[in-house]
Amino acid sequence: MRLFRLELKRILKSRRTMILLVIALLLSVAMAYLPISFEGINRPNEDGTVTELNGLAAIKYKQDLYKTSAGEVTPDRIKSALETYQSCVREYGPVEEEGFPLAVYIEKIVPFRHLLMGLSEAFADPVTGIGADLMDIDPNDIDGAYYEKCAEHLQDVMRNEQRENETAQQKALEKYSELDTPFYLHSGISKDAFDYIELYILFLAILCVAIAASTFAGEYQTGGDSILRTTKYGRKQLAITKILAAFTLFVVTFLVGITVHILILDAAFGTDCLKTSFQMRYSIINLPNINLGQLQIILVAAGLLSVLATVSCTLFLSAKCKDTLTVLLISIVVLLMPLFAYVAMGATWLSTIFPSAGIGMQNNFLYQLADFNYLNIGGMSFWTPHVILLSAGIELFVFTFLAIHSYCRHQVA
């Protein structure tokens, strides 16, 4: 324990480490503020003027509007919202045109527009997948079989995307059949808020890798651990202590940073909107049976696992290489490889088996949850979020073991 405390103290005494930790905490606040600042809406006044609201004022105004549409997403409520929408369009013209009265839009369209979000999808063309125009949908077609209609659309999508893999199609339909219906809606929080959670996790991963790179390689360069390595517990025990100290620092930093980040978001957008079903924020045919509050927890857990798996890879490289710069460069390449692989080739094994597969931009864990990517091998199909988590879990232990093994076998030049 004393050796552990000394190692932790040694890490924290580094000016570079302290600077990176401060940056991590500052980014937590700054990146939570950004999606809040993006919020905006025009509020019509009684005298005919318009007030532009931004930030917290816009969020508060929207919350008051959305209260009327909060509740279970039943076919009757969707039908009523569609009838109101179509009535307004027939009377005032398309909602997107400038001539549409702002007061009517705020009063009759905004409160219920998220109820209609999945309607175009549910009635999409089965061949092309193009969503139906809301004006072309007969309200009488929205009956008790609305959720069956959604399942039919998922079947069409999976048939188009996984045409040669019936196992993937069947697994997606089985997973969708397990969803709790009717869905629940309490609008408020934006997609940007969740995107910035993932972006913050990416920056945290970069900062943690930058700190971890010198764990062993830095000592090789300076010879700082030469004497300790000759003692009874100077190899395996020292390696384990260094790794535990590094992991402790990264776990605490991650949890503090992400907690501050999410608390700021939830304080701004409110917690009622976290009861909203995942399908009502992204796609009506999404597979996860979770709400937005559970989504936050899942993103944090998956993010922490991916960060630790990536750091364990960096620690292995640090134990293997002789200088910090080489470790840092290779680690950054490993960290960003899934992102580049996904952009170049889409969802493949290469983009999902790296320790950092759940971290990034288009390839991040959030987007994998919202997508329908299945990887196929033989007659089996695997949903990419499951592959990402399993790979990261295995690699965390494998790279940690290899780091210890490499450090024990290291020979001082």
Where are these regions (language model features)?
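Transmembrane helix segments
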Residues: Y33-L34, T324-A357
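Alpha-helical transmembrane segments of multi-pass membrane transporters/translocases
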Residues: T17, S306-T314, D371-A413
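Short helix-to-coil transition segments within interhelical loops
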Residues: R229-R235
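Cytoplasmic juxtamembrane regions at transmembrane-helix boundaries
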Residues: T222, T230, T314-L335, C408-A413
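Residue-level recognition of transmembrane alpha-helices
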Residues: L21-A24, K242, S331
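Secretory targeting signals
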Residues: L26-V89, D138-E219, I240-K320, N364, ...
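Aromatic- and glycine-rich beta-strand/loop motifs that create alpha-glucan
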Residues: M1-M18
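Short hydrophobic, aromatic-rich alpha-helical segments embedded in or entering the lipid bilayer
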Residues: W349-N373
